[in-house]
Each structure stands twice: as structure tokens, then as C-alpha cells.
Regions:
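Domain-level signal for soluble alpha/beta catalytic cores
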Residues: 1-362
Length: 362
């Protein structure tokens, strides 16, 4: 009950990449990079376990960017042919590679990452992969020239990868789809179908993370234009409620999304963002607990997973660690209230989160 998790990324150590920066280049020589990334994963796992996080991730320590860290290993994408485009409906500009041929997966991409993390934690393990629509929105395309067709091509390679990750002991596969609250017509036209193709036959819990983005200035400024209530989810949640995805996320910390919209997701597990990633202020346990209680007016505790609003890679490491501790402690307070027992301030015992491979759990 109230199993805690994070949206995905954690800050990288300064010896691995420039801190507090998206797209930060590696600071380690190529010959030593894999070992350095794996060391960083061990730190990320330890930070989460020490904070009492129940469903842990590798913190995306082996990826420079949540999208390009996946697609850089695919055929059909030319990273030498970079162009500047507007992404997320022109919210901000980014220099991106170009699709120049058929998308294909030449070999497993993140299988070794999952095996490494799986071997070093007994907690339930989640791994994040960008969703088809968000990938399409973060690339230039000179080959398919149709966003829906390109999304289905990415869904196919995601599915190949996801099946292997689940077979390696992954408990939760999360597809990151921040584009889902930008292109609502496309969500209905082909976005949900692309998700279904991506998770077809994947034998673990599936999740979709939809959000208003990292806590970077471009996103902060954009959110100021959205009015007093953010109701974009009113169009996407009914579609997701009918989908085959198990878990859906929503930002609930310093958010203008009406929490009653969660009732459109009856039957789904909810990853509720109760940690604000757009500020360096570290929440108290009571602040987190208050946010969890507010969500519980609309979601039963058995279906609620307290979470971060989004990834925390742009934050200072000590801020992110403090927010992890607040998340774990706040959830413990509410569990105490629900059970009538004394709150356990320690990290949960490893046996509580023991994985069950190839099976729905989480």
C-alpha cells in the first residue's frame, strides 16, 4: 500500500557528467564510461533504498537524455545530421538527429542496464523508456513523413526491447509520454494504439508517465500560460482508462490540475506526483503526506503510488536526495494513519520489495 517510486531520472555525479544540466556530455573517457555509469547506478539505487523508495530505477545514469539515450542505438537515425526544431508544440527549441531510413533495432539496447540493476537491488525494479509519440516529437523525419507511421515503427522496436527487459526480471516498464498533454488529437488518432503495440506481450507491469516536463525554465514559463486550471488530461484520461496500460501518472505537487480528474482513471493504478521537481526547496514529510491525503479523496490507497512529478536530473544531488527522503517519510506517515501503527522511519526491508519476474506486480 502506498508503494513509493520516482518518475525516472536522478542527478548524475559530477565526475560522470556536468551537474544540473540536460544533455550534459560525459566527463569520463569512452573506455571507462560503462564502469563509471554502473558505479553511478549503484549510488542511485542506494539513495532510493536509503530513502525508503519501494519501486526503484537506475536513475537513467547511462543516458544523456531520456529520448536520445534510447534512439542513439537504433538504425535509421543519423546523429550527424542534426537540425534545430521546436518540440512539444514549439515550447522550446532543441537540436535533434534526423530519421533517414527504416527504424530497426540492431541488438538489445538496455538489457545489460536492467541486468546490472536487477543484480544489485532486491526492491521492485522499474525501467523507463520514451514512448512512441514523445520520440517522434523529439526527432526530425526525412523518411516516414507521417508522425503516426513513424510512431508505429518506434512502437515495434520498443516492444522488442521491452519483452527482453521483462524476461530479465524487470517489474515495471514505464513509457514516458510528456507529449500526451500537448497533442491530444494525435493521442486519440494513434497515440494509444502506439502504446498498445509497444507493450503487447510484455510480461510485467506497464506504466505511462505523462507530465508537464522537467523543472526547467521553458516549462515553468509555459505552464504560466495554461490558465488557472490545467484540464488537458480531461481528453487523454478517458482514453487511458480504456487502455491496457496498468499505471498512469499525474503531477499533484504545485499543480493546477484538478485532482477530481483522477476519477476518470477508475481501474488504473495512479502514480501521483507529490514531489515538486521545479524547485530546490525540499518538502517536509508532512507536506508530502498532505498531498497524498488529497489524492486519496479520489484514489483508493491500494491503487496509489506516491511519486515525483517528473525526473530530477536538473536538480542538485543533495536536493534530490532530500526530496527522496521526504517522499519516503511522507508515505510512511500516511501508512501509519491508515494502519494505526507507529510510523516506520526506516527504509523498508528488502524482502518487502522482492521482485517477481515476468509477473504483474508494482
Amino acid at each position: 500500500m502506498l508503494a513509493t517510486t520516482i518518475a525516472g531520472s536522478l542527478p548524475k555525479p559530477s565526475w560522470l557528467a556536468e551537474p544540473e544540466k540536460l544533455w550534459a556530455p560525459w566527463r569520463v573517457a569512452p573506455a571507462a564510461l560503462t564502469e563509471a555509469q554502473r558505479d553511478a547506478v549503484l549510488i542511485a539505487l542506494k539513495d532510493q533504498e536509503s530513502a525508503g523508495i519501494d519501486v526503484v530505477t537506475d536513475g537513467e545514469q547511462s543516458r544523456q537524455h531520456f529520448v536520445h539515450g534510447f534512439v542513439e542505438r537504433l538504425e535509421g537515425i543519423d546523429f550527424a545530421k542534426r537540425v534545430t526544431i521546436g518540440i512539444r508544440a514549439d515550447r522550446y527549441k532543441a537540436e535533434v538527429p534526423t530519421v533517414t531510413g527504416p527504424i530497426a533495432r540492431r541488438a538489445p539496447m538496455h538489457l545489460d542496464d536492467v541486468r546490472w540493476a536487477r543484480a544489485h537491488t532486491a526492491r521492485r525494479l522499474k525501467f523507463t523508456i520514451p514512448g512512441p509519440m514523445t520520440i517522434v516529437d523529439t526527432l526530425a523525419d526525412e523518411h516516414y513523413r507521417d508522425r503516426g507511421r513513424l510512431a508505429m515503427a518506434f512502437a515495434a522496436v520498443i516492444n522488442e526491447e521491452a519483452r527482453e527487459l521483462a524476461a530479465a526480471g524487470l517489474d515495471v516498464l514505464q513509457l514516458d509520454e510528456p507529449a500526451f498533454n500537448v497533442y491530444m488529437d494525435d493521442v486519440a488518432a494513434w497515440g494509444i494504439e502506439a502504446l498498445h503495440r509497444a507493450v503487447d506481450g510484455v510480461r510485467c507491469t506497464t506504466a505511462v508517465h505523462i507530465c508537464y516536463g522537467y523543472g526547467i525554465q521553458a516549462n515553468v514559463d509555459w505552464k504560466k500560460t495554461l490558465g488557472a486550471e490545467w484540464r488537458q488530461y480531461e481528453r487523454t484520461f478517458p482514453l487511458l482508462a480504456k487502455s491496457r496500460i496498468d499505471q498512469v501518472s499525474l503531477e499533484c505537487a504545485n499543480s493546477r490540475v484538478p485532482l477530481e480528474l483522477l476519477e476518470l482513471l477508475r481501474g488504473k493504478d495512479i502514480m501521483a506526483g507529490v514531489i515538486d521537481v521545479a524547485t530546490h526547496e525540499i518538502e517536509t514529510a508532512e507536506q508530502v503526506a498532505t498531498r497524498i491525503r488529497a489524492v486519496m479523496r479520489h484514489v483508493e490507497p491500494a491503487r496509489l503510488l506516491p511519486c515525483t512529478n517528473c525526473g530530477m536530473v536538473p536538480l542538485p544531488r543533495e536536493v534530490a536526495r532530500g526530496k527522496l527522503r521526504a517522499l519516503g517519510a511522507g508515505a510512511a506517515l500516511v501508512r501509519h494513519e491508515l494502519s494505526g501503527s507507529l510510523p516506520d522511519r526506516r527504509a523498508p526491508e528488502a524482502s518487502e520489495g522482492a521482485p517477481t519476474a515476468n509477473k504483474k506486480n508494482g
